[in-house]
């Protein structure tokens, strides 16, 4: 998994080693039979705060009841255009979400290309995989991959992504150079959730933020 995540090229940009995103995939196996596994996955990513040694959580998502097959020494292959395996699709899907979330904190809606590719992965996986984990009804039909990428690619939720952008770039990143302005911007960003909640109550992206 480590090789798969670090050796695949997820964007058209080039990055130095220290620019790589600090993230983790915690996979807890809850059932298995031969090479077939059922697991819960917790995905975390962190973002450095400008001019500090502090990292802040940027993305946390728990995906319960995922299914995949894996044999010892099996290569995990990724393709942008076709389904290879559930494990490959899972790892690629969340890798792109992590990168998209990171980009969104530096420029408004900058992660949309990654989100669109993640949606493409979900679409072809739901067509060719026998697993129900790609469907909108997975995990009770609310907190799942389908609705996550639906929210991230919809213009209806741009205001929530803008809150995340302002919270990080105009808030946390300014704390060292101008803490008063930074705190004001952080408060303003969080207060915007109250306005957003009137139109999009308890949305999935709001739940992820907190």
Report residues per predicted region.
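Residue-identity detector for threonine
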Residues: 11, 28, 56, 81, ...
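Start-of-domain marker
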Residues: 2-51
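Aromatic-enriched hydrophobic runs in primary sequence
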Residues: 15, 22, 30-32, 90, ...
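Acidic/His-rich structured neighborhood in mature extracellular/periplasmic domains
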Residues: 35-150
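Alpha-helical context
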Residues: 3, 17-19, 67, 71-75, ...
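Flexible, glycine-rich surface segments
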Residues: 110-208
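Glutamate identity and glutamate-enriched acidic tracts
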Residues: 7, 17-19, 42, 80, ...
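Structured segments of extracytoplasmic/periplasmic soluble domains
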Residues: 3-11, 94-105, 189, 193-196, ...
């Amino acid at each position: 998994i480590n090789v798969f995540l670090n050796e695949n090229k997820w964007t058209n940009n080039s990055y130095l080693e220290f620019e790589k995103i600090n993230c983790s995939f915690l996979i807890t196996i809850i059932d298995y039979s031969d090479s077939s596994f059922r697991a819960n996955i917790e995905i975390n990513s962190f973002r450095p705060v400008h001019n500090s040694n502090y990292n802040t959580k940027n993305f946390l998502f728990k995906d319960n009841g995922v299914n995949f097959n894996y044999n010892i020494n099996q290569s995990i292959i990724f393709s942008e255009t076709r389904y290879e395996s559930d494990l490959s699709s899972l790892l690629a899907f969340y890798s792109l979400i992590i990168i998209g979330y990171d980009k969104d904190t530096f420029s408004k809606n900058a992660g949309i290309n990654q989100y669109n590719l993640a949606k493409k992965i979900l679409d072809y996986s739901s067509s060719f995989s026998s697993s129900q984990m790609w469907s909108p009804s997975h995990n009770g039909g609310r907190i799942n991959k389908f609705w996550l990428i639906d929210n991230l690619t919809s213009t209806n939720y741009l205001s929530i992504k803008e809150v995340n952008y302002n919270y990080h770039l105009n808030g946390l990143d300014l704390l060292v150079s101008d803490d008063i302005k930074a705190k004001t911007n952080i408060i303003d960003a969080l207060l915007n959730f109250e306005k957003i909640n009137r139109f999009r109550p308890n949305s999935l992206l709001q739940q992820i933020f907190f």
